[in-house]
C-alpha cells in the first residue's frame, strides 16, 4: 500500500541528531507514512545506520545524492521526485515531530481538498524539548508576504504540509540560489496565489543552535553568498511584480533586505560593496532619496567609527529600521 505522507530529510554528517529525528517519525500515531532520508555525502556511518533501520522498517528509505550539485535543497528536490505519497512534509535532520503531527496534518488536508499547503506552529529547543520558551505561531495576523520580505517569517521549513502536485507546479526548490532558498519557496508560493491555511497548534520542535559550519552562518561571512543574496532579493521583487503587485509596504520590505545585505558587507570590512548594494534601492526605484542618504550615513558610521562607532551605528540602524518598518506615511520612504 502506498504511503499517504512522505517525510523528507536532507542530512550530512549528523548521525546522532538524525537518529533522533527518525525516532520521532517512527513514534507517529499515524502509520501511513514513508521517511526518505537523502544523504548529501556523509562519512560518519549515516548510510549504514539508516540501512539498518530501513531493513527493520521498510517505510524508511535511504537515498545517497548523486551528481555534482549538493546542498539541502538539492536533496529535498530529490526526495520530492522520489516520494510515493501525495502529501509532503520536510523535516531537517536535527528537528523532531510530535507523535500526533502527521495524523493531524493529514486530516487537515483531507478536509480541505482545495488548499495547496497548511502550516502549523513551531516550538524551539536547544538540547532538550522544553528548555526554551520560544515559539513561532503560524496563526499570526498580517500580510504573510510582507512578513517574509521583512525576515519576520511566519513559518519555517518544517511547519507546512504540502501537496506534492502543488510543489511540482511551483517548480520545487530553486537549486541555483545560494541564499534563502526555503524563504524563496514560501515567497514564491504566496506571490503566486497558492491557497493555504494556518493553524496555531504546535506540532513539531526545531533545534535552535549555533553551528559555524551551517550555511546560515556562512551567509553572514561569505562574499559569494552575499552576492547570491542580491540575486534572491531581485527574484523576490519579480515575484511581487508578477503576482500581487508592488505597493509601498512591499517596497520598504525589499529596501530592508538590501540594507540587511549592505550591513553584512560592512561587517566584512567592505564599505564600497555595502554602498553599491544600498544604491540598488535608487537604481531599482524602490526607495526615496531621503531613505537612501540616511542609510548611507548609517553604513559609514558603522564602517568607520571603530568599535564605538559600530555600536552607535548599530543602535541607530536598529531604530531607523524600526521607523522604516512601522511608518504609516510612504512619502519619506518610497518617493
Tell what function each PLM region has:
Residues 88:
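Short aromatic/hydrophobic "clamp" motif used to bind/position activated sugar donors
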Residues 100-132:
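Conserved donor NDP-sugar-binding/catalytic core segment of glycosyltransferases
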Residues 16-19, 44-52, 96, 100:
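Acidic helix N-cap motif at the loop->helix transition within catalytic regions
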Residues 202-335:
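C-terminal subregions of glycosyltransferases and related glycan-biosynthesis enzymes
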Residues 24, 31, 39-48, 69, ...:
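A conserved acidic beta->alpha catalytic loop
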Residues 7, 120, 139-229:
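Conserved nucleotide-sugar donor-binding catalytic segment
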Residues 1-24:
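N-proximal low-complexity "stem/linker" segments adjacent to membrane-targeting elements
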Residues 65-83:
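Glycine-rich, basic loop-to-helix element that forms the pyrophosphate-binding segment
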Amino acid at each position: 500500500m502506498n504511503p499517504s505522507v512522505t517525510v523528507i530529510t536532507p542530512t550530512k554528517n549528523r548521525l546522532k541528531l538524525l537518529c533522533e529525528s527518525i525516532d520521532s517519525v517512527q513514534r507517529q500515531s499515524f502509520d501511513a507514512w514513508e521517511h526518505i532520508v537523502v544523504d548529501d555525502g556523509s562519512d560518519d556511518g549515516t548510510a549504514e545506520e539508516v540501512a539498518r533501520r530501513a531493513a527493520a522498517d521498510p517505510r524508511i528509505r535511504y537515498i545517497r545524492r548523486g551528481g555534482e550539485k549538493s546542498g539541502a535543497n538539492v536533496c529535498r528536490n530529490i526526495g520530492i521526485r522520489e516520494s510515493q505519497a501525495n502529501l509532503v512534509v520536510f523535516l531537517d535532520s536535527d528537528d523532531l515531530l510530535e507523535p500526533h503531527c502527521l495524523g493531524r496534518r493529514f486530516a487537515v488536508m483531507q478536509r480541505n481538498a482545495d488548499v495547496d499547503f497548511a502550516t502549523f506552529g513551531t516550538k524551539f529547543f536547544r538540547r532538550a524539548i522544553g528548555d526554551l520558551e520560544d515559539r513561532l505561531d503560524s496563526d499570526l495576523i498580517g500580510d504573510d508576504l510582507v512578513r517574509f520580505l521583512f525576515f519576520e517569517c511566519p513559518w519555517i521549513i518544517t511547519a507546512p504540509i504540502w501537496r506534492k502536485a502543488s510543489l511540482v507546479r511551483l517548480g520545487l526548490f530553486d537549486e541555483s540560489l545560494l541564499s534563502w532558498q526555503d524563504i524563496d519557496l514560501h515567497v514564491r508560493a504566496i506571490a503566486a496565489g497558492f491557497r493555504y491555511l494556518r493553524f496555531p497548534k504546535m506540532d513539531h520542535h526545531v533545534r535552535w543552535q549555533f553551528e559555524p559550519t551551517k550555511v546560515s552562518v556562512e551567509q553572514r561571512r561569505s562574499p559569494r553568498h552575499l552576492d547570491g543574496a542580491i540575486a534572491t532579493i531581485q527574484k523576490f521583487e519579480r515575484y511581487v511584480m508578477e503576482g500581487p503587485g508592488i505597493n509601498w509596504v512591499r517596497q520598504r520590505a525589499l529596501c530592508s533586505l538590501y540594507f540587511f545585505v549592505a550591513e553584512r558587507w560592512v561587517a566584512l570590512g567592505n564599505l564600497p560593496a555595502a554602498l553599491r548594494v544600498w544604491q540598488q534601492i535608487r537604481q531599482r526605484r524602490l526607495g526615496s532619496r531621503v531613505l537612501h542618504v540616511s542609510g548611507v550615513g548609517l553604513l559609514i558610521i558603522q564602517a568607520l567609527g571603530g568599535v564605538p562607532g559600530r555600536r552607535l551605528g548599530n543602535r541607530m540602524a536598529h531604530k531607523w529600521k524600526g521607523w522604516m518598518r512601522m511608518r504609516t506615511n510612504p512619502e519619506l520612504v518610497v518617493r
